[in-house]
A protein has these predicted regions:
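Short coil/turn segments at secondary-structure boundaries
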Residues: 9, 31-37, 65-73, 178-180, ...
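Mid-domain, small-residue-enriched loop/turn segments at the edges of structured enzyme/sensor domains
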Residues: 148-150, 182-223
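Conserved catalytic neighborhood of penicillin-recognizing serine enzymes
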Residues: 4, 130-186, 234, 246-276
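Non-catalytic, structured segments within soluble enzyme domains
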Residues: 1-43, 50, 191-192, 196-197, ...
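Active-site SXXK
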Residues: 52, 84, 106, 110-137, ...
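A penicillin-recognizing enzyme superfamily signal
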Residues: 42-65, 76-80, 89, 96-108, ...
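Glycine-rich, acidic and aromatic/proline-enriched surface loops and short helix-turn segments
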Residues: 16-24, 78-95, 128-130, 142, ...
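Second-shell loop/turn segments in exported
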Residues: 2-9, 36-43, 102-111, 149-155, ...
Length: 427
């Protein structure tokens, strides 16, 4: 009956994860853990955990269903980008005291929407297929298996660069890139970043838009984006640094082990594009914080009960820098025509980015946020913007290119353009 007398403790969601991890590491039951006199040293940043609990107590920071007026649920992961240590978590807006089993939403599977695009398409495209931020992708009408693929705004823009396609989260270029590199290639790549897929997922072109069979968890998304933030190296998350037994003997000591999954050059290029997303793209409410970020929105299911309903199912945000990776999910445990997120500007990107902004501003207060360091294997190149946008050519800026038409772009060393623009030469 020991589990029935689960002790009450503060920071419930975090402590549940600590106890679960400790029981697994020591191979003991929870009741033995409670009564065995162990001392567990956790990775929690107590001040930050208390802050996120206060943040999550503010109901106006979460969208309400436009039909029922119910406030949505949310999950939050704050991970140390470098070590994989969890420093603060929220598995819901509040912790339901006195219950034996509690739904921890950071471990609940949901469809990821566009937040998965960089993981299954663009990062492997840069790593394995020599894509650059100015690789041109055709954003023109596309039908896959008889289903039209549409951008969120239902517009198409013709030839766009990869930087624009990813930072603005266009759907058509994402599907085209995913098909170009091969669905299995993209899936295998993301598996190395800790995201599990089913056999069926290997055959889904819409996987790049979040159309997974079983979905993913906020924890898995945090791990994957922390790999981008940590220069291409993957590690498992943990809540525990050390465990001592009742005699003071250390019975477990965490040792961080990392695996280099892709190059730091690839990581830097994707991070730089996702900084554009945080400045002028889908996560623009994070502007000025030097963060890289990717939003994700999941549409309501294609079921008769939702035919007349305007709204969305899930809203995601992954934001990160070299020190902290933050993932926010918002939605309802059971989406219905009564309970769903509002669509439009009050939907996905707004509330998730507001939470992340509050969090990073609190962590860094008035101090400078760290930026991603450019690896030696990446060249900074000045391009001619007119040639890029009007001629759809990747050409170096010349001495004649006016300053306002010079754009800085990044290439892996050896793949830089060599031809100079003649756009400004008077005939």
């Amino acid at each position: 009956f020991a589990e029935d007398i689960k002790p009450a403790y503060i920071h419930g969601y975090f402590m549940d994860m600590v106890l679960e991890e400790a029981a697994s590491l020591l191979n003991v039951g929870l009741d033995d853990l409670y009564t065995g006199g162990y001392r567990i040293y956790t990775t929690m940043d107590k001040e930050l955990q208390e802050y996120v609990e206060q943040l999550y107590a503010q109901e106006d920071l979460f969208p309400k269903s436009p039909v029922s007026g119910e406030t949505s649920e949310s999950a939050l992961v704050v991970m140390d980008t470098d070590t994989g240590e969890l420093v603060a978590v929220m598995g819901g807006r509040s912790y339901p005291e006195g219950q034996r089993s509690v739904l921890n939403r950071i471990e609940a599977r949901r469809l990821p929407g566009s937040v998965i695009k960089p993981l299954v398409a663009y990062t492997p495209a840069v790593e394995m297929f020599d894509y650059t931020p100015v690789t041109f992708i055709d954003d023109s009408p596309l039908t896959v298996n008889g289903i039209p693929i549409r951008n969120a705004d239902r517009e198409t823009r013709g030839i766009v660069t990869m930087r624009e396609a990813l930072s603005k989260s266009y759907n058509i270029p994402a599907v085209k890139t995913f098909q170009e590199i091969g669905i299995s290639t993209g899936v295998s790549f993301a598996e190395k970043l800790g995201i599990p897929f089913t056999e069926d997922d290997h055959y889904r072109p819409n996987l790049v838009l979040g159309g997974m069979e079983q979905g993913t968890t906020p924890l898995e998304i945090a791990r994957a984006f922390a790999s981008l933030g940590d220069r291409g190296s993957y590690k498992e998350e943990t809540t525990i640094r050390r465990i001592d037994d009742s005699h003071g003997k250390t019975v477990y000591q965490n040792r961080i082990s990392k695996e280099q999954v892709f190059s730091e050059e690839t990581a830097f290029i994707i991070n730089d594009i996702l900084q554009t997303a945080a400045d002028t793209g889908t996560a623009y409410r994070l502007k000025g914080l030097k963060l890289a970020a990717k939003t994700g929105t999941v549409q309501l299911p294609s079921l008769p009960e939702f035919d007349e309903v305007k709204g969305i199912n899930d809203a995601w945000l992954a934001a990160y820098n070299p020190e902290y990776t933050v993932v926010v999910w918002m939605g309802f445990d059971r989406t219905s025509k009564e309970n769903h997120l509002p669509s439009g500007s009050s939907g996905g990107g707004k509330y998730t980015t507001l939470i992340a902004r509050e969090l990073y501003e609190h962590i860094y207060d008035e101090s400078e946020l760290p930026n991603f360091q450019k690896p030696v294997g990446v060249s900074e190149v000045k391009l001619d913007k007119k040639a890029l946008e009007e001629q759809k050519r990747v050409l170096l800026a010349s001495a004649l290119t006016p300053d306002e038409y010079v754009v800085t772009e990044y290439f892996k060393r050896g793949s830089e353009p060599t031809e100079q623009s003649d756009y400004w030469v008077v005939p």
